[in-house]
C-alpha cells in the first residue's frame, strides 16, 4: 500500500489535529520547518477547479517524527479533532494505548467544548462523553503521560469570535 501513495494521498485521508510546542530555540526552528512544509510541499487543495481554490496546510506524521527525535519539540494530542479523542470514541483500549504512545502529553478540554457532539448526535449523551474522557484519563495515567487541561481557544476577546466564524465559514465558499 505504501508504494501506491503519491503526492495527492493527503487529499484522500481525514486530517487530525495535533499540538506542537517548541521547548527551545532549536525547537522553534524545527517548528518553523514543519509550518513551511505544511504550506508548501503538503498543502492540500480540496478543489479540482482553479476557481475558488481552498487550501489547507497539513503535515505528515513522519515529518513530525523526524524533527521530534532531537528532543526540542513536545507533541500534544490536541482537541476533539485529534486522533486520541477519535480513537477513544470509536476503537478499542489497546488501539487507544497504541495511539497515545506517540504523544508527549494528552490534552482535555472542558465538557462544554464537546457539547456540539451531543447536539449532532455523534455522542449519545453527557454520560457517554464522560466515559470517553475517563477512558482517556485512565489510559494517560497508565502510560505516565501528563494530562493538560486546555481550552482549545481560538481567540482572546469575545468580539473576535465573529472574525473566526467568518474565516472558518469562508473556507467553504
Q: Where are the model-predicted features located?
A:
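Phosphodiester-processing cores and adjacent nucleic acid-binding clamps
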Residues: 1-173
Amino acid at each position: 500500500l505504501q508504494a501506491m501513495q503519491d503526492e495527492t494521498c493527503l487529499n484522500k485521508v481525514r486530517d487530525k489535529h495535533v499540538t506542537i510546542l517548541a521547548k527551545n530555540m532549536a525547537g522553534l526552528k524545527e517548528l518553523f520547518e514543519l509550518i513551511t512544509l505544511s504550506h508548501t510541499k503538503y498543502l492540500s487543495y480540496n478543489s479540482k477547479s482553479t476557481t475558488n481554490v481552498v487550501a489547507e496546510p497539513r503535515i505528515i506524521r513522519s515529518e513530525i517524527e523526524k524533527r521530534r527525535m532531537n528532543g526540542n519539540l513536545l507533541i500534544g494530542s490536541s482537541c476533539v479533532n485529534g486522533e486520541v479523542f477519535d480513537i477513544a470514541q470509536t476503537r478499542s483500549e489497546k488501539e487507544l494505548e497504541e495511539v497515545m504512545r506517540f504523544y508527549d502529553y494528552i490534552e482535555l478540554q472542558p465538557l462544554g467544548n464537546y457539547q456540539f457532539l451531543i447536539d449532532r448526535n455523534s455522542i449519545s449523551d453527557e454520560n457517554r462523553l464522560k466515559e470517553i474522557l475517563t477512558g482517556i484519563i485512565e489510559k494517560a495515567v497508565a502510560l505516565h503521560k501528563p494530562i493538560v487541561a486546555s481550552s482549545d481557544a481560538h481567540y482572546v476577546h469575545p468580539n473576535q469570535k465573529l472574525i473566526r466564524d467568518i474565516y472558518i465559514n469562508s473556507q467553504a465558499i
